[in-house]
Regions:
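Short S/T/G/P-rich N-terminal loop/turn motif that feeds into the first structured element of a domain
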Residues: 1-53, 60-70, 93-109
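C-terminal structural segments of small proteins and small subunits
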Residues: 77-90
Length: 109
């Protein structure tokens, strides 16, 4: 089942270091089954705020996405993003959950 990786940037403390992250990420993705859907393209915030940029990618499975995220190549550079910018990152399975199953086993019960 396809999985979407969504990262929303909420703030940047050191752009130079974040640019090092962006420059270093491509080699970690070589040979990976990631389909880039949107990466820091123009956007419009409909609700909420504090959005500086958005990344959306499609992976063939949750396992494939997690394997890349936990790979030694990505582990070696992800601190450049984590230490120098504030992001929310999620993996979302494709599909639509029925209303009665939405938010089950989550903190919002």
């Amino acid at each position: 089942m396809p999985v979407y990786m969504v990262y929303v940037c909420h703030g940047v403390s050191d752009r130079v270091q974040l640019e090092k992250y962006w420059a270093s990420i491509e080699p970690t993705l070589e040979g990976q089954p990631l389909k880039l859907l949107a990466a820091y393209t123009p956007f419009e915030v409909l609700e909420g705020g504090d959005v500086l940029g958005v990344f959306i990618g499609e992976w063939p499975s949750m396992e494939a996405a997690k394997a890349w995220y936990d790979s030694s190549g990505y582990k070696a550079i992800r601190h450049l993003r984590q230490d120098n910018a504030r992001y929310t990152g999620v993996l979302v399975e494709a599909g639509v959950a029925p209303p009665e199953e939405r938010l089950r086993n989550r903190i919002y019960q």
